[in-house]
Amino acid sequence: MQAIVYFITLLLPAFLVAQIDLPPASPDAAWTHQVGFTQIELSYSRPHMRNRKIFGALVPYDVLWRTGAGESTRIKFSEDIVFGGKLVKKGQYGLYSIPGKEEWIIILNQDATLHGDFGYDEKKDVLRVKVKPTNSPTTNESFTIELTDFKPDYSASLEMKWENTSIKVPIMSTADDRIMAQIQENLIVKKVENAGLLNKGAQYYFFNKKDLNQALEWSITSETLSVDNINYSVLTANILERLKRYPEAIESAQKALELARKKDMTDDVKNLEEKIKDLKIKKSK
């Protein structure tokens, strides 16, 4: 008996060591991006094609899908956001979908704790949006979710790609509401005379195609409060150019050019000289 015990004791370490570790078939993935003031966090699993037909086969059409593998896909917004054209409150959600040949349904569900779609309750859906799939020019071996199409208006797209299919859901931050409220309070109601604030307001109106005449007023005032800031004069010139007031735009650009020469800003001098040439051409037409 003692011999048997001794023999088993000798074999036990070998059994404990004898193992083969393989990476998961559907590795985890996670990312965090910022759109406007909103932090977007997403975690999901990335299954692979492995020479299989995906949509309409492995992932059937018109059936709820966990939008990944393993645990349910989770998405979290730090602030309210417009998702697929609909306002969504800040918080964490389960991201589900119903793939279709001609149309997909993208779902945000209150329950982000499920394993896949087991226990999914449609009554907990906070949003359903319909999107059209498009053909991807390249084959995507592994399922991928990423943010794409970032734009200056604080918008982007949540894109899902697998096989030769791409799905995009438009996302837009509510940053504009907050910024416009701050501009309203500080520059319109209180009429704060601060060069930096006035320039920011003018920039925001200019780049987001709002009231250009108001932007011009703020930009000119910022110049009078900070006479040696080249960026303020450049912005004034850009606003005047968009308003097609070319003679005045040339004057503002000339002012910026003089400041650039005075400060030995070689690159700015070159750029402004080119800009003035371009403005003179536009003026002559």
Which residues does each predicted region cover?
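Bacterial Sec-dependent N-terminal signal peptides
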Residues: M1-L22
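Short N-terminal segments immediately surrounding and downstream of signal-peptide cleavage
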Residues: I20-G36
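Extended, well-structured beta-strand/loop surface patches
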Residues: L22, Q39-K90, S97-V189, E193
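Alpha-helical adaptor scaffolds
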Residues: I183-L240, K244-E248, E258-L259
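Boundary/linker segments of alpha-helical solenoid repeat arrays
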Residues: N229-N231, A260-L272
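Alpha-helical linker/edge segments of TPR/alpha-solenoid repeat scaffolds
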Residues: R242-S252, K262, K275-K285
